[in-house]
């Protein structure tokens, strides 16, 4: 840390709206839009080609197609999201199926401690299993009442809103439960293995 | 694949020079207190602190070559309603200091492989310029060409430095006497510039990058050889 450095002539103008001050993690700024950041081309997945699989250290590997996924119980997340590129979107909502609901069917084995999420197109990200359970994560197909747009990961993306948003893998198709942490795409490319925005865990070693 | 140099802590850099690249973009030449190695394509995080302790961070691509060992350069496109870019463009000048950390990113980096096609839209040229400059300084034998799309001549960064290795396209208006009418990149432009078995680096606004990545797929590039970096406030 730099202790006391002041940027000459800087006063700032993106302070969060009144009443939302406590909702911005360190180093984040308030963004009213929904920026798009993706590695490589934007995937085009039709719902009739869409599948979601939960495998690895589970009692039953389970695979859903779009129709069987739509038949699962649904819940909504109301709150904030934080991107490692510094923007935070406050007061948004997503709905879909909680990861708890998926794991209820797959039944994790006791030694499962980590999850590697894989997307159509091959993107991967790793998340501790504890960060995906107890109502903290979803496979979301709806954003603010509308089908999730393709550029935001539609038809469905992982949603782990308490971690930086690269963990919320767009176009997710597989959750693999593992005993050991296996780093995903950004985690191998300089980004933090867990990514807690409140601890500002942006990069490897933060 | 070699690992890219990883990020170090915050430090104060001296702004040793600053100059406009276009009416709305400025390059800052920064001398680091504790220099680090980096690869072309990596970026830095800049942190501004107000007198009341309020801080703002943003990321900026490095424009200079790692072979330029004495300082790094970042080019900042001024966003009209931005918080940090107007400060960097309008307020900060040579003799000031700037807090930053880097180098960041291990994906959109050039490690010397070839052949390489660079496609930049607007200020998306910045990290590509680091690659172009580094190739000129260290690896002139690596085949490399650039397609650069800008709205008007006034939006073109590094105009005096782009040579035969860069092809320019104007989407709104070209310079006086420019032979082509204004237009966007076409499938034929990308197909003509494509290298079989090459890497492609694409950087620019989201819509531009999406469109170019699709054109590269059509031109036969597999997705894993299309490296993208998307810019833009929304």
Language-model regions, residue ranges each:
Chain A
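Structured, non-membrane catalytic/scaffold regions adjacent to prosthetic-group chemistry
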Residues: 2-206
């Amino acid at each position: 840390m730099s202790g006391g450095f002041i940027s000459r002539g800087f006063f700032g103008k993106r302070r969060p709206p009144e009443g939302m001050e406590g909702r911005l993690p360190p180093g984040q700024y308030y963004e009213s839009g929904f920026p798009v950041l993706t590695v490589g081309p934007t995937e085009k997945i039709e719902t009739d080609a869409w599948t979601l699989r939960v495998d690895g250290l589970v009692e039953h590997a389970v695979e859903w197609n779009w129709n069987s996924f739509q038949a699962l119980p649904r819940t909504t997340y109301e709150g904030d999201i934080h991107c490692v590129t510094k923007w935070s979107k406050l007061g948004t909502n997503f709905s879909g199926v909680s990861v708890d609901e998926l794991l209820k069917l797959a039944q994790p084995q006791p030694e499962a401690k980590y999850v590697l999420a894989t997307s159509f197109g091959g993107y991967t990200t790793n998340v501790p299993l504890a960060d995906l359970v107890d109502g903290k994560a979803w496979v979301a197909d709806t954003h603010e009442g509308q089908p999730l747009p393709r550029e935001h990961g539609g038809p469905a993306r992982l949603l782990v809103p308490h971690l930086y948003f690269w963990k919320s893998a767009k176009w997710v198709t597989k959750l693999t439960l593992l005993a050991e942490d296996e780093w995903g795409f950004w985690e191998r490319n300089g980004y933090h293995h867990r990514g807690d925005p409140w601890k500002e865990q942006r990069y490897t070693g933060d | 694949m070699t690992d890219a140099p990883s990020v170090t802590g915050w430090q104060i850099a001296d702004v040793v020079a600053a100059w406009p690249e276009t009416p709305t973009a400025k390059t800052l030449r920064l001398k680091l207190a504790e220099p680090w190695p980096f690869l072309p394509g990596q970026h830095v995080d800049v942190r501004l602190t107000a007198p009341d302790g309020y801080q703002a961070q943003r990321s900026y691509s490095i424009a200079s070559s790692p072979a330029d060992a004495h300082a790094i350069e970042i080019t900042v496109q001024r966003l009209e309603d931005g918080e940090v870019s107007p400060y960097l463009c309008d307020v900060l000048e040579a003799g000031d200091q700037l807090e930053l950390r880097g180098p960041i990113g291990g994906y959109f980096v050039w490690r010397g492989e070839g052949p390489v096609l660079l496609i930049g839209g607007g200020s998306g040229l910045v990290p590509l310029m680091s690659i172009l400059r580094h190739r000129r300084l260290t690896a002139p034998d690596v085949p490399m060409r650039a397609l650069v799309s800008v709205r008007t001549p006034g939006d073109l960064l590094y105009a005096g430095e782009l040579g035969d290795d860069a092809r320019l396209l104007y989407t709104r208006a070209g310079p006086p006497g420019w032979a082509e009418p204004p237009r966007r990149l076409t499938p034929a432009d990308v197909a003509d510039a494509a290298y079989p078995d090459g890497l492609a680096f694409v950087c620019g606004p989201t819509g531009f990058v999406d469109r170019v990545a699709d054109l590269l797929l059509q031109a036969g590039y597999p997705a894993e050889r299309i490296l993208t970096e998307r810019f833009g406030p929304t």
